[in-house]
Amino acid sequence: MPTSTWNRHHVLSLADFTAAEYDIVLKTAASFQEVLSRRTKKVPALQGQVVANLFFEPSTRTRSSFELAAKRLSADTLNFAASTSSMTKGETILDTAKTYLAMGTDIMVIRHKEAGVPNAIAQEMDRLGVRVSVLNAGDGQHEHPSQGLLDLFTICSLVDPANPRLELLQGKKIAIVGDILHSRVARSNIWSLIASGAQVHLAAPPTLLPKLFAEYIFGEETAPPGQLFIHWQLEPALQDADFVMTLRLQKERMTAHLLPSLREYHQLFGITRAKLQLCQPNVKVLHPGPVNRGVEISSDLMDDPEFSLIQSQVTSGVAVRMALLYLIGSGKT
């Protein structure tokens, strides 16, 4: 598997990923996808290493797939729950991380409601001079790198199952619809899709997609080699789209009344079969989950395998997270 050109010790953001790094992840994930199709779905790649899942926020897909990915690589896993930890007694996040370090952890997978926590822990590990890698599993509204990579892998694998690679999305139109303001998934996907040369169209109500969002992300309105477009109506984003990604309304992060009602939101921005008629005939729909049925996407469309890639995203998640753990862990053996 391709590790010779992989030099990244931590995976904290996709903002500085190179095209070569994207392709290494895609190629490695494709190899592990084949492993997962076997009767015995396990390899000894990380045998003897310890992967600690430090989740300070609730999670189903991300936590479970990271745990399964580590076990498929034969690593030992530790699962942390803040509600039953010493943090309830006042222990700090950094002290918690150091506790897991003292137990011999090799890779820390970290999710937290506050942006920057994985970066802070990575910096502390580097300061201590230890060979512990940190993988960001979602931090506040900042980023969710593994989700961005698994979405990229899901799309590229559909275009060319035998050889998923970044260049396959050059010129493709991809719409991202929903609560972009609060979405770490949107930010990671924007970085990866822009890097591929895709045309990325964001669509949401103005309260969930500020006018200066592109400048906030890039410091300018567009970033080569792809292009970023902002729409406050759904139709321009869907017109001739090859892929549509719809995002959950993150009501837990909304500090103000940003929407009149969920019913009105669904009428204006919810994805339905009828609205997909604006897209390319073979359009596919993605959602990172969890899904609010009948809000971001109609229930019948979500369950329709002709259009929906939602279950494929979950499947891809294990292979992609195996790839990430393998790539950052292979230098430790």
UniProtKB/Swiss-Prot annotation:
InterPro entries: Asp/Orn_carbamoyltranf_P-bd (IPR006132), Asp/Orn_carbamoylTrfase (IPR006130), Asp/Orn_carbamoylTrfase_sf (IPR036901), Asp_carbamoyltransf (IPR002082), Asp_carbamoyltransf_Asp/Orn-bd (IPR006131)
Single biological process term from Gene Ontology: 'de novo' pyrimidine nucleobase biosynthetic process
Catalytic activity, reaction form: carbamoyl phosphate + L-aspartate = N-carbamoyl-L-aspartate + phosphate + H(+)
Residue sites binding carbamoyl phosphate per the record: 61-62, 111, 144, 147, 289-290
PROSITE patterns, per the entry: CARBAMOYLTRANSFERASE
Stored SUPFAM superfamilies: Aspartate/ornithine carbamoyltransferase (SSF53671)
Disulfide bonds: none
GO cellular-component term (any): cytosol
Positions contributing to L-aspartate binding: 89, 184, 248
Associated pathway: Pyrimidine metabolism; UMP biosynthesis via de novo pathway; (S)-dihydroorotate from bicarbonate: step 2/3
Enzyme Commission number, as recorded: 2.1.3.2
Gene Ontology MF annotations: amino acid binding; aspartate carbamoyltransferase activity
Record keywords: Pyrimidine biosynthesis, Transferase
Protein's UniProt keywords contain Transferase: yes
Any matching Pfam family: OTCace
Subunit structure, interactors included: Heterododecamer (2C3:3R2) of six catalytic PyrB chains organized as two trimers (C3), and six regulatory PyrI chains organized as three dimers (R2).
Alphabetical list of PANTHER family matching this protein: ASPARTATE CARBAMOYLTRANSFERASE (PTHR45753:SF6), ORNITHINE CARBAMOYLTRANSFERASE, MITOCHONDRIAL (PTHR45753)
Function as written in the Swiss-Prot or TrEMBL entry: Catalyzes the condensation of carbamoyl phosphate and aspartate to form carbamoyl aspartate and inorganic phosphate, the committed step in the de novo pyrimidine nucleotide biosynthesis pathway.
Alphabetized HAMAP family for the sequence: Asp_carb_tr (MF_00001)
Similarity comment: family membership: Belongs to the aspartate/ornithine carbamoyltransferase superfamily. ATCase family.
Protein's UniProt name: Aspartate carbamoyltransferase catalytic subunit
Source organism of the structure: Trichormus variabilis (strain ATCC 29413 / PCC 7937) (Anabaena variabilis)
